[in-house]
Amino acid sequence: MLGTIFVWWYNPTIIGKEQIPHEGAVVLAGNHKHAFDPIFVGVCTKRPIHILAKKELHDSVFGWFFRLTGTIAVDLEAERNPKAFAEALTYLNDGNVVNLSPEAERNYTEHILLPFKFGAVVLAKRTGCPLIPYAITGDYRFRSRNLKITVLPPIDISDLSIDQSNEKLFDTIKGQLCAAQGREPS
Protein backbone atom coordinates (compact mmCIF):
# COMPACT_ATOMS: atom_id res chain seq x y z
CA MET A 1 0.00 0.00 0.00
CA LEU A 2 2.81 2.39 0.90
CA GLY A 3 4.41 1.65 -2.47
CA THR A 4 1.18 2.45 -4.32
CA ILE A 5 0.87 5.81 -2.56
CA PHE A 6 4.55 6.51 -3.25
CA VAL A 7 4.17 5.77 -6.97
CA TRP A 8 1.07 7.97 -7.25
CA TRP A 9 2.62 10.86 -5.31
CA TYR A 10 6.11 10.91 -6.87
CA ASN A 11 5.44 9.46 -10.34
CA PRO A 12 8.85 7.72 -10.55
CA THR A 13 10.37 6.12 -13.62
CA ILE A 14 11.66 2.60 -12.99
CA ILE A 15 14.22 1.14 -15.38
CA GLY A 16 15.65 -2.37 -15.21
CA LYS A 17 13.42 -3.91 -12.55
CA GLU A 18 13.68 -7.19 -14.49
CA GLN A 19 17.28 -7.37 -13.18
CA ILE A 20 15.89 -8.41 -9.77
CA PRO A 21 15.24 -12.17 -9.87
CA HIS A 22 11.85 -13.48 -8.76
CA GLU A 23 13.46 -15.89 -6.31
CA GLY A 24 16.72 -16.54 -4.53
CA ALA A 25 18.98 -14.43 -2.37
CA VAL A 26 19.94 -10.99 -3.69
CA VAL A 27 21.91 -8.04 -2.32
CA LEU A 28 20.68 -4.70 -3.68
CA ALA A 29 23.03 -1.75 -3.23
CA GLY A 30 22.69 1.86 -4.33
CA ASN A 31 23.13 5.51 -3.55
CA HIS A 32 21.23 7.14 -0.69
CA LYS A 33 19.80 10.58 -1.36
CA HIS A 34 16.48 10.55 0.53
CA ALA A 35 14.71 8.85 3.44
CA PHE A 36 12.23 7.37 0.94
CA ASP A 37 14.88 5.53 -1.09
CA PRO A 38 14.01 2.13 0.47
CA ILE A 39 10.34 2.57 -0.49
CA PHE A 40 11.40 3.47 -4.01
CA VAL A 41 13.54 0.33 -4.25
CA GLY A 42 10.64 -1.67 -2.84
CA VAL A 43 8.36 -0.78 -5.75
CA CYS A 44 10.86 -2.40 -8.15
CA THR A 45 9.88 -5.92 -7.07
CA LYS A 46 6.95 -7.76 -5.56
CA ARG A 47 9.36 -9.55 -3.22
CA PRO A 48 9.74 -8.48 0.41
CA ILE A 49 12.96 -6.56 0.96
CA HIS A 50 14.90 -6.44 4.22
CA ILE A 51 16.58 -3.05 4.61
CA LEU A 52 19.64 -2.21 6.65
CA ALA A 53 18.85 1.07 8.42
CA LYS A 54 20.30 3.11 11.24
CA LYS A 55 19.35 1.76 14.67
CA GLU A 56 17.85 5.09 15.68
CA LEU A 57 14.83 4.20 13.53
CA HIS A 58 14.27 1.10 15.66
CA ASP A 59 14.54 3.24 18.79
CA SER A 60 12.05 5.86 17.56
CA VAL A 61 8.30 6.11 18.11
CA PHE A 62 7.91 4.20 14.82
CA GLY A 63 10.33 1.48 15.89
CA TRP A 64 7.52 -1.07 15.95
CA PHE A 65 6.94 -0.45 12.23
CA PHE A 66 10.59 -0.92 11.32
CA ARG A 67 10.84 -4.13 13.35
CA LEU A 68 7.56 -5.42 11.87
CA THR A 69 8.79 -4.89 8.31
CA GLY A 70 12.04 -6.78 8.86
CA THR A 71 14.33 -3.77 8.86
CA ILE A 72 17.79 -4.63 10.17
CA ALA A 73 19.13 -2.15 12.75
CA VAL A 74 22.71 -0.96 12.16
CA ASP A 75 24.76 1.07 14.62
CA LEU A 76 26.47 3.62 12.37
CA GLU A 77 28.86 4.64 15.17
CA ALA A 78 30.23 1.11 15.62
CA GLU A 79 33.27 -0.14 13.75
CA ARG A 80 31.52 -3.47 13.15
CA ASN A 81 27.91 -4.66 13.43
CA PRO A 82 28.03 -8.42 14.02
CA LYS A 83 24.36 -8.68 15.01
CA ALA A 84 23.14 -6.78 11.93
CA PHE A 85 25.54 -8.73 9.71
CA ALA A 86 24.32 -12.07 11.11
CA GLU A 87 20.69 -11.03 10.65
CA ALA A 88 21.32 -10.01 7.03
CA LEU A 89 23.15 -13.30 6.39
CA THR A 90 20.20 -15.24 7.81
CA TYR A 91 17.78 -13.46 5.48
CA LEU A 92 20.07 -14.10 2.50
CA ASN A 93 20.65 -17.75 3.42
CA ASP A 94 16.86 -18.12 3.50
CA GLY A 95 16.69 -16.81 -0.09
CA ASN A 96 15.52 -13.27 0.63
CA VAL A 97 16.40 -9.81 -0.70
CA VAL A 98 18.56 -7.46 1.39
CA ASN A 99 18.90 -3.78 0.43
CA LEU A 100 21.51 -1.40 1.75
CA SER A 101 23.30 1.78 0.88
CA PRO A 102 27.07 1.34 0.98
CA GLU A 103 27.30 5.09 1.70
CA ALA A 104 25.71 4.24 5.10
CA GLU A 105 24.03 7.64 5.31
CA ARG A 106 22.20 10.13 3.15
CA ASN A 107 24.44 12.17 0.92
CA TYR A 108 23.95 15.91 1.50
CA THR A 109 27.28 16.86 -0.07
CA GLU A 110 28.21 18.11 -3.53
CA HIS A 111 30.01 14.79 -4.11
CA ILE A 112 28.17 12.37 -6.37
CA LEU A 113 28.76 9.56 -3.83
CA LEU A 114 30.16 9.23 -0.33
CA PRO A 115 32.89 6.64 0.29
CA PHE A 116 31.46 3.11 0.43
CA LYS A 117 31.51 0.77 3.40
CA PHE A 118 32.05 -2.91 2.65
CA GLY A 119 28.81 -4.54 3.87
CA ALA A 120 27.18 -5.08 0.48
CA VAL A 121 30.16 -6.80 -1.12
CA VAL A 122 30.97 -8.87 1.97
CA LEU A 123 27.36 -10.11 2.16
CA ALA A 124 27.32 -10.96 -1.55
CA LYS A 125 30.69 -12.72 -1.42
CA ARG A 126 29.87 -14.62 1.77
CA THR A 127 26.59 -15.97 0.36
CA GLY A 128 27.53 -16.17 -3.32
CA CYS A 129 24.32 -14.34 -4.23
CA PRO A 130 23.97 -11.71 -6.96
CA LEU A 131 25.03 -8.15 -6.14
CA ILE A 132 22.68 -5.84 -8.00
CA PRO A 133 23.50 -2.12 -8.07
CA TYR A 134 20.96 0.65 -8.55
CA ALA A 135 21.12 4.42 -8.96
CA ILE A 136 18.45 6.89 -7.86
CA THR A 137 18.39 10.25 -9.63
CA GLY A 138 16.05 13.22 -9.79
CA ASP A 139 13.91 15.01 -7.24
CA TYR A 140 11.41 13.79 -4.68
CA ARG A 141 8.70 16.29 -5.61
CA PHE A 142 4.96 15.87 -6.06
CA ARG A 143 4.34 14.27 -9.47
CA SER A 144 8.04 14.57 -10.27
CA ARG A 145 9.04 14.45 -13.90
CA ASN A 146 12.60 13.32 -13.27
CA LEU A 147 12.65 10.93 -10.28
CA LYS A 148 14.16 7.72 -11.60
CA ILE A 149 15.66 4.48 -10.34
CA THR A 150 17.84 2.47 -12.66
CA VAL A 151 18.40 -1.12 -11.57
CA LEU A 152 21.60 -2.30 -13.21
CA PRO A 153 22.67 -5.84 -14.16
CA PRO A 154 24.32 -7.89 -11.40
CA ILE A 155 28.04 -7.28 -11.14
CA ASP A 156 30.43 -10.21 -11.08
CA ILE A 157 32.72 -9.96 -8.07
CA SER A 158 33.51 -13.67 -7.76
CA ASP A 159 37.19 -13.34 -8.69
CA LEU A 160 37.80 -9.98 -7.00
CA SER A 161 39.08 -9.08 -3.55
CA ILE A 162 36.80 -7.25 -1.14
CA ASP A 163 38.51 -3.93 -1.97
CA GLN A 164 38.28 -4.54 -5.72
CA SER A 165 34.63 -5.60 -5.38
CA ASN A 166 33.78 -2.45 -3.46
CA GLU A 167 35.59 -0.32 -6.04
CA LYS A 168 33.69 -2.03 -8.86
CA LEU A 169 30.36 -1.45 -7.10
CA PHE A 170 31.27 2.20 -6.45
CA ASP A 171 32.38 2.78 -10.06
CA THR A 172 29.25 1.11 -11.47
CA ILE A 173 26.85 3.26 -9.43
CA LYS A 174 28.92 6.41 -9.95
CA GLY A 175 28.99 5.78 -13.70
CA GLN A 176 25.19 5.57 -13.83
CA LEU A 177 24.76 8.71 -11.70
CA CYS A 178 27.21 10.64 -13.89
CA ALA A 179 25.51 9.43 -17.08
CA ALA A 180 22.15 10.60 -15.72
CA GLN A 181 23.66 14.03 -15.08
CA GLY A 182 25.37 14.15 -18.46
CA ARG A 183 28.88 14.29 -17.05
CA GLU A 184 31.98 12.14 -17.15
CA PRO A 185 32.99 10.14 -14.06
CA SER A 186 36.09 11.69 -12.52
Locate the predicted segments by residue.
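Short, basic, glycine/proline-bearing loop/turn elements
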Residues: 2, 69-75, 103-106
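A short, well-structured juxtamembrane/interface segment
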Residues: 3-24
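Catalytic core of membrane glycerolipid acyltransferases/transacylases, capturing the structured
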Residues: 7, 22-79
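A generic structural signal for alpha->beta connector loops
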Residues: 9-11, 48, 68, 95, ...
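Structural motif corresponding to alpha-helix initiation and N-cap regions
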Residues: 14-17, 59, 82-85
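Residue-level "edge-of-site" marker
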Residues: 18, 79, 137
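Non-catalytic C-terminal accessory region of glycerolipid acyltransferases
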Residues: 83-186
